[in-house]
């Protein structure tokens, strides 16, 4: 019986050691948890940067569209290959 208790104590000690210090143990868990937190911060910064770039792209696209629309309506400009038709109300003449 004494050998059995010693064997169980050794087994329990080995299990505790592997739990706290072994591969995929508690120390590895905390290390990975810290790495995840750092990576999430990096991802947040990159996501914010991407959102800013998408907003800038949308502004540039809409800006060009707005400039083109203004040139068409106010200045009567047309693109190559297009034909411009102006419909005039009879009341204006």
UniProtKB/Swiss-Prot annotation:
Keywords, sorted A to Z: Cell cycle, Cell division, Cell inner membrane, Cell membrane, Coiled coil, Membrane, Transmembrane, Transmembrane helix
A biological process from GO: FtsZ-dependent cytokinesis
Major localisation: membrane
Intracellular or extracellular location(s): Cell inner membrane
Topology Cytoplasmic: residue spans: 1-3
TM helices/strands, residue ranges: 4-21
Domain of life: Bacteria
Coiled coil: 31-75
InterPro entries referenced in this protein's UniProt entry, alphabetically: Cell_div_FtsB, FtsL/DivIC
Topology versus the membrane: Single-pass type II membrane protein
GO CC annotations, alphabetized: cell division site; cell septum; plasma membrane
Periplasmic side: 22-93
Record's function text: Essential cell division protein. May link together the upstream cell division proteins, which are predominantly cytoplasmic, with the downstream cell division proteins, which are predominantly periplasmic.
Assembly notes: Part of a complex composed of FtsB, FtsL and FtsQ.
Entry similarity comment: Belongs to the FtsB family.
PANTHER family: CELL DIVISION PROTEIN FTSB
Protein name (database record): Cell division protein FtsB
Native species: Vibrio campbellii (strain ATCC BAA-1116)
Source taxonomy: Bacteria, Pseudomonadati, Pseudomonadota, Gammaproteobacteria, Vibrionales
């Amino acid at each position: 019986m004494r050998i059995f208790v010693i064997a169980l104590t050794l087994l329990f000690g080995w299990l505790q050691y592997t739990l706290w210090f072994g591969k995929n143990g508690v120390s590895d868990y905390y290390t990975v948890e810290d790495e995840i937190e750092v990576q999430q911060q990096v991802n947040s910064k990159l996501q914010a940067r991407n959102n800013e770039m998408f907003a800038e792209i949308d502004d540039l696209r809409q800006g060009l569209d707005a400039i083109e629309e203004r040139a068409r309506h106010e200045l009567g400009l047309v693109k190559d290959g297009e034909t411009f038709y102006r419909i005039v109300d009879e009341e204006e003449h």
